[in-house]
């Protein structure tokens, strides 16, 4: 009597051009009309075990690569394990090869949409990166220097209060920031260095904690350069940009090991006069990025990166509509021409990743940031101080941000089905001095708030995904966050107030999650998600006012589907809701937090990606939300600036060579700027276009923003203001920063081959 061996097929998948491993490749194993699906790990490895003798067919799919099929035989008299090396050839995007359920994480089917956008849409700025998140709108209102105002799923997230942002696992949001809670300045990121975007809308992912109420976005930088490059750009109204990205390891050069290693540097310089403003913006920014990635062993990788960013700018602020109507200023004029500021951030980031023989993955990361911020603004002009004006100076006098992220992931067979367990542990600390001052023409003459703050967060999470059947998955998890707050007031002009403004407190928040996924087939996934999340409050509020919520909870829930109605079309739809215990708004003039009470938001997200021909793609995002305060009377319960209807769509032509082009629109509808809807924030429709021409080693590009030269309000608020000579009580109306007019930009890029080839 003989018994068939139980065999194993395993392998490593690499890029046929660069020889770099390809993570998250969909691998399909077929035999006797039975199919198994897996994905490669972070090191490009895959494995199928418990295989009986017979004939097998392997097919490999990865977005941006040509699919590949190969046949294998497992014979009873051969070794139990077959190891193979597979190389995939880079190729144009083909939506017919994209499967819905072939993801490393069962809950990340939405990121199929993001991956398509990353391959098709040009990104030339940090703003472009944020706009890759479906349904996310942004607004800039300080000469380009401040973090963008973010709108998503019915939230005016301010500068990040309700949207968490990460770059290579490092948090971007700043707790208890001088300009507002959760402030997320992405301008230290050079867009050409970004390799991938992971989006998690809602409160359903255990990995994300503070600020991840409307959602979270995580950007991952490239581990290597396919080509060295130099790019030069010139735009109307005095816009200049220069970029260089260079590999620093030549052929057969190594640093720490004899295995595959990469080291590259990227440097960017931006200067934008923005002369369409009467008070020229003169925005100037320098960026530097250095990254090492290497395989220390066959199972362990090391990533080390450093970032430097510095910018300086002038701003025209938000101007009241009546000042334009009365002819006091033009649309691009300024009532206080001395607005502006400076900011800088320096980052260090190191990550060690190990994949064990049993497939378990251990990740350890440490990071450090040093941050400065100095902003001069004037929101109300002469409402509070009729002599000197209401100018304020918000200042971060050197923030230290440092932390650790760790996780352990393992798959086990439990009752004949797969159970994936992820255990995570993290910490984050912020310390430094924060201040708010009264200023006139950038000369400070009074201190409103000044003190040192320390915020410490320790978090842990457990995430379990159990495959009940071949099609049904349940994901359950819980996250625990502990916060400790400390603030020491340092007012010298009013020392008698320091004790009452100082203090410490701590709070723990538990956030359970429960999600269900059903893979109807390779092209249809149904899902139902739910979970608690939160956004934290400012240290200056929680240590002095015990009645304020320290960590207000959010409950999110949604049902939906990601599916392919035809081979070359991908659709995602979700019906969602989110209840927030406490709506928090930062009052910049006095450094206080305004509590607005409970809110509920209900909405629908709809996204389509469609490949019309081999080189022509169409995309559409439509988003609707209905948000209201729960405890306010009907008609008085609008959530100010909460977006209701937004849409983005475009056509992209991307052949292998020659001309490529993109034509895209952005639309946001009118929305309430105040609770009773008596003041309206105006919507807009903008059309943008890009044309590129590629020849060997060169790319020439033309970009046109706001093709129809529409007058539009980029940032807008209901604000009580007073100009000189007006009644003391001021006037409550819409104040706004005008959006840019039509702008033409030309660019040229020179590519030269990366000669590095490590074995």
Predicted regions mapped to residue ranges:
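Short, acidic, small-residue-rich periplasmic hinge/interaction motif at the N-terminus
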Residues: 14, 26-30, 61-65, 79-119, ...
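Transmembrane beta-barrel wall of Gram-negative outer-membrane proteins
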Residues: 8, 234-273, 277-316, 340-357, ...
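Short acidic/polar hinge/loop motifs at secondary-structure boundaries
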Residues: 171-201, 219-220
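C-terminal beta-signal and adjacent terminal beta-strands/loops
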Residues: 618, 670-671, 693-759
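Membrane-embedded beta-barrel scaffold of Gram-negative outer-membrane proteins
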Residues: 255, 351-355, 361-379, 519, ...
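Short strand-turn segments of transmembrane beta-barrel domains in outer membranes
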Residues: 198-206, 215-250, 276, 550, ...
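Gram-negative outer-membrane beta-barrel transporters
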Residues: 408-409, 415, 576-579, 595-675, ...
């Amino acid at each position: 009597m003989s018994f068939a061996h139980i065999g194993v097929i395993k392998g490593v998948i690499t890029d046929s051009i660069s020889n770099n491993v390809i993570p998250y490749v969909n691998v399909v194993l077929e035999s006797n009309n039975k199919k198994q699906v897996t994905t490669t790990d972070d090191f490009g490895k895959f494995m199928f075990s418990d295989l009986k003798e017979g004939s097998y067919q392997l097919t490999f799919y990865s977005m941006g690569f040509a699919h590949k099929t190969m046949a294998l035989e497992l014979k009873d008299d051969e070794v139990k394990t077959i190891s193979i090396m597979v190389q995939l050839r880079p190729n144009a995007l083909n939506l017919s090869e994209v499967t819905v359920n072939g993801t490393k994480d069962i809950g990340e089917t939405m990121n199929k949409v993001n991956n398509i956008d990353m391959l098709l849409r040009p990104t030339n700025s940090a703003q472009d990166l944020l706009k890759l998140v479906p349904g996310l709108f942004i607004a800039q209102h300080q000469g380009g220097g401040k973090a963008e105002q973010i709108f998503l799923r019915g939230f005016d997230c301010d500068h990040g209060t309700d949207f968490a942002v990460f770059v290579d696992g490092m948090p971007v949001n700043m707790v208890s920031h001088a300009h507002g809670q959760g402030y997320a300045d992405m301008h230290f990121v050079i867009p050409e260095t970004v390799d991938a975007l992971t989006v998690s809308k809602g409160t359903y992912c255990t990995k994300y904690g503070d600020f991840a109420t409307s959602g979270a976005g995580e950007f991952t930088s490239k581990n290597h350069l396919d080509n060295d490059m130099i790019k030069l750009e010139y735009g109307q109204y005095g816009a200049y940009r220069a970029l260089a990205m260079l590999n620093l390891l030549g052929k057969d050069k190594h640093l720490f090991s004899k295995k595959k290693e990469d080291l590259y540097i990227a440097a960017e310089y931006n200067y934008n006069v923005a002369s369409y403003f009467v008070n020229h913006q003169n925005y100037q920014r320098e960026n530097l990025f250095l990254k090492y990635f290497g395989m220390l062993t066959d199972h362990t990788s090391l990533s080390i990166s450093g970032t430097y960013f510095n910018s300086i700018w002038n701003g025209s602020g938000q101007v009241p509509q009546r000042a334009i109507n009365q002819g006091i200023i033009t649309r691009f004029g300024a009532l206080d021409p001395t607005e502006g500021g400076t900011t800088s951030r320096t980052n260090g980031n190191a990550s060690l990743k190990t994949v064990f023989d049993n497939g378990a993955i251990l990740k350890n990361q440490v990071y450090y940031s040093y941050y400065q911020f100095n902003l001069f603004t004037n929101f109300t002009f002469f409402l509070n101080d009729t002599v000197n004006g209401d100018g304020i100076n918000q200042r971060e006098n050197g923030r230290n941000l440092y932390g650790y992220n760790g996780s352990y992931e393992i798959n086990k067979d439990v009752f004949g089905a797969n159970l994936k367990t992820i255990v995570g542990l993290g910490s984050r600390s912020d310390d430094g001095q924060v201040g708010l001052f009264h200023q006139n023409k950038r000369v400070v003459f009074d201190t409103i708030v000044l003190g040192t703050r320390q915020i410490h967060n320790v978090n842990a999470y457990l995430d379990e995904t159990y495959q009940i059947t071949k099609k049904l998955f349940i994901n359950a998890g819980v996250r625990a966050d502990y916060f400790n707050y400390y603030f020491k007031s340092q007012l010298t002009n009013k020392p008698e107030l320091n004790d009452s403004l100082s203090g410490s407190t701590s709070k723990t928040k538990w956030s359970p999650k429960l999600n269900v996924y059903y893979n109807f087939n390779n092209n249809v996934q149904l899902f139902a998600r739910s979970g608690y999340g939160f956004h934290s409050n400012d240290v200056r509020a929680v240590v002095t006012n015990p009645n304020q919520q320290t960590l207000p909870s959010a409950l999110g829930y949604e049902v939906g589907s990601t599916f392919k109605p035809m081979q070359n079309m991908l659709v995602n739809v979700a019906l969602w809701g989110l209840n927030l215990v406490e709506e928090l708004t930062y009052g910049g003039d006095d450094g206080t937090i305004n509590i607005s009470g409970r809110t509920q938001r209900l909405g629908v997200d709809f996204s389509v990606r469609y490949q019309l021909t081999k080189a022509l793609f169409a995309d559409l995002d439509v988003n609707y939300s209905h948000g209201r305060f729960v405890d306010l009377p009907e008609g008085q319960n609008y959530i100010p600036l909460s977006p209701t209807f937004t849409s983005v769509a475009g056509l992209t032509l991307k052949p292998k060579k020659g001309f490529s082009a993109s034509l895209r629109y952005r639309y946001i509808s009118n929305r309430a700027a105040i609770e009773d809807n008596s003041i309206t924030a105006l919507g807009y429709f903008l059309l943008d276009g890009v044309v590129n021409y590629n020849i060997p080693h060169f790319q020439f590009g033309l970009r046109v923003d706001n093709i129809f030269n529409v007058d539009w309000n980029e940032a807008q608020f209901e604000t009580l203001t007073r100009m000189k000579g007006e009644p003391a009580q001021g006037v409550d109306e819409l104040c706004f920063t005008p959006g840019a007019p039509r702008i033409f930009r030309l660019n040229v890029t020179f590519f030269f081959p990366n000669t590095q080839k490590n074995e």
